[in-house]
């Protein structure tokens, strides 16, 4: 483990959870170290990689970089929690091991947060696809009209099957003291949606979130990224996390209304996934029962999975003309892929 560079508390600690990230980890770290106008440290938490990731990090000569090697795989939430526990900075910024940040990102965000008296800040982001295209996720004019991100707006944007990009893709920074005082950490039981629960919890316990309209975070989609496949166990885990969130925090009327929409989206998604499984098994009675119990689940046939679902239905009707159906997972288009409803370009 590299020792801390200096005794002075840095402005920002970048927390980078890394798992088999040898091809991108150095690029991510270098972008963090290149921040202008703020002092930084980078805490890389290796989550039991089987490649050269820890060796590459350990070889970086900059004393601002620290490596923590976990003795067991804890997933992204657990690795980030280990990094937060080791952080020394006033602010904590999570950086994915295959992404990068622009040099002025943290200066802009901290200035925005300090001016608003905020404990949290989010900004815009650019998404770079496999073919090198770069698209801005939100219009700067749209975000300029949103000086602060509120809990109702955040929940509403994270309703499954919405056609708009959701604020859940933003990468917030948090005041470390605020996280400590509120005892906030990532939910290690979640593999999809852990970012959402942390920011929602921070807003629910009174955190103020400033919005920086410029794009300082660069979200890279690459081959080999964790596939964004939405499964029944993911839905059940997110429902359980939301139920725990509701038990912990008292929401105002508007936030409750948005939360009701979000839970309804989960129920529809669950019914839809059950329907797909029943069609795959050629269980007409089960499929009809599910459709009758939750007819709203059928309206999502415009999703990319629709073509697969129709093929499954055709195989059910004409089983002799087709081989056994293959699994047809619902992709994270349900939560809106960063470049649109295309499962080929979504990343974990």
From Swiss-Prot:
SUPFAM superfamilies: Nucleotide-diphospho-sugar transferases (SSF53448). GO terms for biological process: polysaccharide biosynthetic process. Glycosyltransferase required for the synthesis of succinoglycan (EPS I). Needed for the addition of the fifth sugar (glucose), catalyzes the formation of a beta-1,6 linkage between the fourth and fifth sugar. Residues 324-334 have a biased composition (Low complexity). CDD domains: Glyco_tranf_GTA_type. Pathway: Glycan metabolism; exopolysaccharide biosynthesis. It comes from Rhizobium meliloti (strain 1021). Belongs to the glycosyltransferase 2 family. GO terms for cellular component: cytoplasm. Keywords: Cytoplasm, Exopolysaccharide synthesis, Glycosyltransferase, Plasmid, Transferase. This is Succinoglycan biosynthesis protein ExoO. It is an enzyme of class 2 (transferase). The lineage of its organism: Bacteria, Pseudomonadati, Pseudomonadota, Alphaproteobacteria, Hyphomicrobiales. Its main location: cytoplasm. It comes from the Bacteria. InterPro entries: Glyco_trans_2-like, Glycosyltransf_2, Nucleotide-diphossugar_trans. Its EC number is 2.4.-.-. Residues 322-348 are annotated as: Disordered. It is found in: Cytoplasm.
């Amino acid at each position: 483990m590299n020792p801390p560079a200096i005794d002075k508390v840095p402005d920002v600690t970048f927390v980078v959870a890394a798992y088999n990230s040898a091809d991108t980890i150095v690029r991510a770290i270098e972008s963090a170290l290149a921040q202008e106008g703020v002092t930084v440290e980078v805490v890389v938490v290796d989550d039991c990689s089987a490649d050269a990731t820890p060796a590459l990090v350990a070889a970086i000569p900059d004393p601002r970089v620290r490596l923590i090697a976990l003795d067991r795989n804890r997933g992204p939430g657990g690795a980030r929690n280990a990094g937060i526990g080791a952080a020394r900075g006033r602010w904590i910024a999570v950086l994915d091991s295959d992404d990068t940040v622009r040099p002025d990102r943290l200066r802009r965000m901290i200035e925005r947060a300090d001016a608003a008296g905020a404990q949290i800040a989010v900004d815009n982001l650019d998404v770079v696809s496999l073919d090198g295209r770069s698209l801005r996720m939100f219009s700067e004019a749209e975000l300029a009209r949103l000086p602060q991100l509120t809990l109702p707006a955040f929940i509403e944007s994270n309703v499954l099957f919405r056609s708009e990009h959701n604020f859940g893709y933003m990468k917030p920074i948090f005041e470390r003291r605020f996280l400590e005082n509120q005892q906030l950490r990532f939910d290690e039981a979640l593999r999809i949606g852990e970012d959402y629960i942390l920011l929602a919890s921070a807003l629910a316990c009174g955190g103020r979130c400033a919005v920086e309209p410029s794009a300082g975070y660069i979200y890279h989609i690459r081959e080999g990224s964790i596939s964004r496949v939405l499964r029944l166990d993911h839905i059940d885990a997110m429902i359980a996390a939301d139920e725990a969130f509701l038990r912990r925090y008292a929401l105002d009327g508007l936030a409750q209304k948005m939360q009701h929409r979000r839970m309804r989206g989960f129920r529809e998604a669950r019914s839809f996934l059950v329907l797909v499984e029943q069609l795959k098994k050629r269980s007409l009675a089960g499929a009809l029962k599910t459709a009758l119990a939750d007819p709203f689940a059928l309206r999502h046939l415009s999703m990319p999975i629709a073509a697969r679902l129709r093929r499954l239905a055709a195989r059910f009707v004409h089983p002799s003309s087709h081989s056994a159906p293959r699994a047809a997972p619902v992709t994270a288009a349900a939560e809106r892929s960063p470049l649109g409803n295309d499962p080929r370009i979504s990343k974990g």
